[in-house]
């Protein structure tokens, strides 16, 4: 065989090998390009566009130990197969679903970076069942915590402290294409004040935020040490049931700004930093029922800033400064509640009007029912006020509080007082 022939054969072989390598590279590129799991290093964010995906799918697709890996346990010198460390944010795209459940996850620990919170943001659906999701600080081998001297009541210094700490959060976005269901799980040490508004910290990064995802469910969870607890804006048709909500920095449950058609039932809400359950700013068609709420610095249950056509019933509220507080809201009903050991049992205040307060048991308050500051045309009837320490019924007529109706209220060990 001539050398010329050898050169031709060698060239042909090189071309063939090159072609095969090119085909393999092109195939891999296409597979990556068409994958429903991708990673944006610039944003440090994992994108999920799969119809259904879980953490094993993400791990298999990305194979990137710097952003997602199983936890190594030094005591056993082995990997905990169901404890995951996430060092990035996640975005669930429209029409996609991310499943985080006990089949492959026991505990998801999310590490915030120095510049980003590394949130889970949902434009599709999120399904969480029987897992624990928290922030994590690998340097301290502990949750990401706010300094102990941060107190909501000291708003200026607290805001400075809160804004210095970044923590991951879960946020369901306004245009989410499906419901999010979080149940039987523990959500803790999430949320921060990384997004500020004129008068404080935005609820957008507050910890567990639902701005969309019609027919979502939050059920049978432990929710604690979250910055703002549960928060929603414009959310509709949602069930919040059977949760323990406690030790959150500001509020326990805070439906906000146009939230509507929501049921908040059978939750235990206690020891949060300011208010237990507050619905504020144009919320309507909210039912708050069957909850036990206690031990907050300010208020147990509050209707605030134009809340209307809503109900608080069959709740047990105790050991509060104000057990139930209706402020600047109208056409609501407060009935069949038991409130006890509060400075004020039921406060109707700040131009609240046309509300009905009836069939409530108000036990050992300082003031039983307190009506003031322009609250008018409200009805109070068939309430039982037992052992009020100071005043069973207080009506501040000097501040344009008028046209309120009181009928068939029972007062034991005290007499009504008009100031």
What are the functions of these language-model segments?
Residues 4-6, 10, 79, 321, ...:
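Hydrophobic alpha-helical segments, principally membrane-spanning helices and signal/leader peptides
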Residues 243, 291, 337, 360, ...:
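Detector for the Zn2+-coordinating histidines of canonical Cys2His2
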